[in-house]
């Protein structure tokens, strides 16, 4: 566990330091970052214990569970989202230090009620895309989010995103850059540090301002629920020991908190999340020993799997994790027991040990966080819509498009006139974004030998059709075209000048440049 000081993509901020006491011992953290990051950097991964005394650490890492709750200056707070700034003392919650006989006196406070057309719970890509479209349709909205920044999961994403667009906007941009643009310049009506704790009768939403410790209410004609998802953790022996983390924890700590939880990683799950977190771990200075996948084939996008192969990371299909091997004091792990499997059942006699690891990165999917959606549908009826991962787990592209689509649906329920063709177009794009990559070509096209000898050229290792076309915008000569999500990009080698702009703009790192005259090869390396 260490602080990341150099990164090929991210700019490491140089903030001041702040020292606080953890269980009576001084710990120094960086201002503007969480208590969880400070404790891990100081070598304290244990934050709580089970009822029978087992060491516990972070679980979701994004403020959606109570696994990291500790006493922070006498108040129960989640250390994964609580900054170290001005904190004096942090300690584990025990029966001894949390039992109190004091009575809490009720406070007389004026009731604050905000009224709007549409309330949006969640300031992630789906919620903010919905807000933008509602604004274009002439509807007011209030956005409520428990985090201190807008952007949701995009804030943790350093990779470039796939988008199929008619006009270039988000395609090829990195997640944290997209997060900065989603709300535009006008952030009015966005309430951060605010948690929705109930949806009441008469379409009233109860909210707590966690920063100022006060309650307020939002009354709206319609409701959008963009609450995202929570990580799914499979069960295996010692799945609760520190060193076993979900991808959300690994990614949040690495890309948002600049904290590397380990140097030698075993990833479980060969899907897009497994590929991307493994790739980002390598960028941050860790070594990924292997990726396990219980299915007999790889998941995710083939271009993402290929970028992993180019780094030399092996992908073992039909393999599952049986056990995490803890160290002597159970504050970390030293290895894992894996085996071959069939239909998600272990095959006896195939067990083997992968040693020399200090983190298991669990990338086995997400579960929609849809409790508020369920209650919202009871209260608002058809005027309640779910967007993003709250209704269907998908890519960031899908979340943005669903947010836009839902805005039109809510506008229709509120009898607001709009161009229906625009709604149909967005709906088609949303459906297309769910498309699993379909293999179109067997091998990458190449120019004729005569053209190869004339000037530099590129080849596309993009053999599958799916919703992505940033390469077509990257080419200044318009030599790359892609007519739909069901085809692969086509290169006009007569127009291609070999400028290599497309090599660095492909989100899947799937374009390679060649200059046979000078024997040069241009690789997509980040």
Regions found by a protein language model. Name each.
Residues 23:
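ABC transporter nucleotide-binding domain catalytic core, centered on the Walker B motif
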Residues 1-18, 30-526:
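Residues forming the flavin
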